[in-house]
């Protein structure tokens, strides 16, 4: 049975197009027997924003404040959750050409030297290996493969850095470019999702 971690990151609640697609994917994969865990980073599972104190604490050490210890434990939980699943599905709506702050914050919690990646004599090496990632990205305009898409290239870079190089992408484009474009973008994205196996 495939174990799947779904990360939602939209802050739009019931108006979120990425959430519609993610829910479609979850329903599709549940019929295939996947065990799904959902973390709603833009909603009920929002994380504390990583600041200087937290960032310092995530490096570990003997003299951590109570807050740093709590945030380090949270990071350990997020990393364990990441490593415990076979497939990571990331809902990545485009906000001002890039990912939501809530998703970037999750990345800051899990990207830890010696934990999810390490540095070697030949360069960095990811420690989260043997995983698959699926990116579901929604955007109001048409940005795929263009210079204004700072969502997919960035996420592929981060995932590759921690060892996840098997990455598939579902695009829902031009969602704010009129009703027909919206319906076409969502329909094509759902069709792409229907082709994915858990």
Curated annotation (Swiss-Prot):
It is an enzyme of class 1 (oxidoreductase). FMN binds at residues 10, 16-18, 94-97, 138-141. Its EC number is 1.6.5.-, 1.7.1.17. Keywords: Flavoprotein, FMN, NAD, Oxidoreductase. The keyword NAD applies. It comes from the Bacteria. Quinone reductase that provides resistance to thiol-specific stress caused by electrophilic quinones. Also exhibits azoreductase activity. Catalyzes the reductive cleavage of the azo bond in aromatic azo compounds to the corresponding amines. This is FMN-dependent NADH:quinone oxidoreductase. It comes from Shewanella baltica (strain OS223).
């Amino acid at each position: 049975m495939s174990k799947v971690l779904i990360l939602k990151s939209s802050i739009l609640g019931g108006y979120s197009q990425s959430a519609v697609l993610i829910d479609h994917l979850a329903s599709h994969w549940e019929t295939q027997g996947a065990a799904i865990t959902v973390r709603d980073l833009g909603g009920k599972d929002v994380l504390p924003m990583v600041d200087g104190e937290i960032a310092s604490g995530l490096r570990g050490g003997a003299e951590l404040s109570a807050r740093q210890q709590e945030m380090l434990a949270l990071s350990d939980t997020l990393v364990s959750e990441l490593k415990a699943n076979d497939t990571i599905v990331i809902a990545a709506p485009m906000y001002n050409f890039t990912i939501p702050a809530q998703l970037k914050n999750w990345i800051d919690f899990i990207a830890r030297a010696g934990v999810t990646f390490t540095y070697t004599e030949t360069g960095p090496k990811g420690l989260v290996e043997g995983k698959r990632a699926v990116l579901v990205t929604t955007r109001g305009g048409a940005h795929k493969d263009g210079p204004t898409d700072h969502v997919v290239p960035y996420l592929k870079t981060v995932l590759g850095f921690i060892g996840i190089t098997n990455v598939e992408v579902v695009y829902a484009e031009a969602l704010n470019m009129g009703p027909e474009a919206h319906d076409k973008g969502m329909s094509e994205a759902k069709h792409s999702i229907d082709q994915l196996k858990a």
